[in-house]
């Protein structure tokens, strides 16, 4: 599924096998078929979906059955007996890890995140994995018992008896920064896309189970931003005054984080002090303007009856697009080596200057579903998710909506990274 090519793979314990020869074979085909047949390109809804890309999972389609011993549940490594508890290790990835971190934050437990690979007495630590050190939490009366209870729903955590690493950095060093428990402000109301706001709210309430303060955008002038560490601006058109924008700038400069989605990026586009621009160079902008003028001249001879069909060339109602990841950046932790974004709008920005372009569409990218020909040509070299650092804070730009309908699990994890991992 990742390369769209034939390849060898190793079947390992706890891998999932879905048979196509079963009573629900048609449903299995629908959920795993990446290339959906479209009877007509006129569509009001997404035109591609499949479980491997939605979950960011490594998956293979087989032409023959395989005969291996199977089981109905996932097996977890048993907890070893330990004499000393130095720390707890929690692998990062998926809803259970996000809920575990949320639970720890809500109970005032200090948590660290690995920034590099390391090997700790049989535990392979990956970037983004969580470490809870006993030394960081002297306020907990019974450290081992408290963390064990809080992680009751997380089956794959491990107990670490020593902070010395076989390879990579020792625990507690600069390679394991403390994560700040975010204080989240979410704006709603006039101008904010109600569906996209609802998707963020659902994520906070159900997926992460983490508190967020919801305030009507008309009251933004009365909000004391310093009471929060993170502001989420869901897709929409925010009618901020110049004073509101200045206050937002100061919030970021002093260490705050703003997560901006969809059309909300307009607040930062072409603004002094930020590097969010549609085009990387004046030449690129000139070429785009010239093509638009040429197309407008040519369209004078177009007939009215084919107008809707012609407009399709520059639209996308929902397709899967391959993205290259900067795997070293916290925004990409747990996502693997590539990310497939579910793109539902034609909005695009060329790769940004002076910004961490964490996920971007490469040249010759793979795609699934319908994309208009004109738009498809423009997508190469455009950024999907980026982080701009300003002063002590940051702005996370989300051109695509990773929370679309709440079912794109890789997107849910990416948003979790923006909320919890990007300090």
Please provide the spans of the model-predicted regions:
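Intrinsic-disorder/low-complexity accessory segments
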Residues: 1-423
């Amino acid at each position: 599924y990742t390369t769209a090519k034939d390849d060898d793979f190793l079947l390992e314990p706890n891998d999932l096998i879905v048979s196509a020869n079963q009573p629900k074979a048609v449903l299995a085909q629908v959920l795993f078929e990446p290339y959906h047949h479209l009877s007509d390109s006129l569509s009001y809804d997404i035109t591609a979906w499949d479980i491997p890309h939605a979950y960011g999972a490594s998956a293979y389609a087989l032409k023959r059955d395989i005969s291996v011993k199977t089981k109905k549940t996932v097996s977890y490594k048993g907890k070893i007996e330990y004499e000393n508890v130095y720390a707890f290790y929690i692998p990062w990835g998926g809803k259970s890890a996000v809920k575990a971190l949320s639970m720890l934050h809500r109970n005032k437990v200090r948590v660290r995140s690995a920034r590099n690979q390391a090997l700790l007495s049989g535990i392979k630590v990956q970037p983004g994995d969580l470490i809870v050190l006993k030394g960081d939490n002297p306020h907990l009366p019974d450290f081992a018992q408290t963390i064990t209870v809080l992680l009751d729903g997380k089956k794959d955590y491990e107990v670490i008896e020593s902070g010395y690493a076989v390879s990579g950095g020792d625990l507690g060093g600069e390679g394991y920064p403390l994560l700040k428990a975010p204080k989240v402000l979410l704006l709603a109301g006039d101008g904010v896309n109600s569906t996209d706001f609802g998707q963020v709210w659902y994520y906070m309430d159900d997926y992460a189970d983490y508190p967020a303060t919801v305030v009507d955008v008309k009251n933004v002038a009365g909000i004391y931003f310093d009471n929060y560490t993170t502001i989420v601006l869901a897709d929409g058109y925010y009618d901020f005054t110049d004073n509101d924008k200045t206050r937002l700038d100061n919030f970021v400069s002093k260490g705050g984080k703003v997560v901006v989605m969809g059309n909300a990026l307009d607040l930062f586009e072409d603004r002094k002090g930020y590097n969010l621009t549609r085009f990387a160079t004046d030449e690129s902008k000139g070429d785009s303007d010239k093509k638009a003028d040429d197309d407008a001249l040519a369209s004078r001879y177009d007939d009215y009856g084919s107008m809707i069909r012609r407009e399709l060339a520059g639209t996308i109602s929902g397709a899967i697009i391959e993205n290259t990841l900067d795997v070293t950046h916290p925004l990409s932790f747990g996502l693997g080596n590539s990310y497939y974004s579910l793109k539902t709008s034609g909005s695009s920005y060329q790769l940004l200057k002076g910004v961490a372009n964490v996920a971007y569409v490469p040249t010759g990218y793979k795609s699934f579903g319908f994309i208009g020909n004109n738009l498809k040509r423009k997508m190469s070299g455009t950024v999907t998710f980026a982080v701009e650092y300003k002063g002590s804070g940051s702005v996370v730009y989300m051109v695509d909506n990773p929370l679309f309908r709440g079912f794109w699990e890789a997107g849910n994890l990416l948003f979790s990274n923006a909320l919890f991992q990007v300090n």
